[in-house]
Amino acid sequence: MEIFHIDEDIRKSETLPSSFYRERAWFERSISEIWEKCWIFIGDNTDQNPAGTLTPMILLPDVLNEPVVLSTDSDGEVYCLSNVCTHRGKLVVSSSCSGQRILRCGYHGRCFRLNGTFKSMPEFDQTENFPTE
C-alpha cells in the first residue's frame, strides 16, 4: 500500500494516488481512520418525531454497517444510540414504532431509557453492585 503525504501548504498539493480509489486496503483503512472517527449526518430536525418514537437504521450501509436507533424522549430530545444490547449483542429495535417509554432487549429483557442509560434487567433488582447507570 503506497503511502502519501498531505502538505499543509496548499501550493504543494497533489492528487491522491489512483490506488487510493481502487485498492481494498485503502478502503478498509479509510473506515478505521476516517469514518469510524467522525460525525456522520443522518438527518435534521425538520421531521421531528413525537415522544416515544424509535427509528432503527444502519449507519453507512456497506461501509460501517453500524446499527443505530433514533429515539425521542418525553422532552422532545432526540438521541442516536447503538441499537445493540450491551448484554448479548442482540438488536434492540427491529422496526420503527411509537409510544415507547423504554428500549427493551428481546433476549433477556434488559431495559434502557430513551436516552440510552441503563434502567433494569429482570431478576437483578436485588443484586449488589449491578450496574444501574
Please report, for each region that a protein language model flagged, where it lies by residue.
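N-terminal pre-ligand scaffold of iron-sulfur
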Residues: 1-95
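Long, hydrophobic, well-ordered secondary-structure blocks that form the structural core
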Residues: 79-133
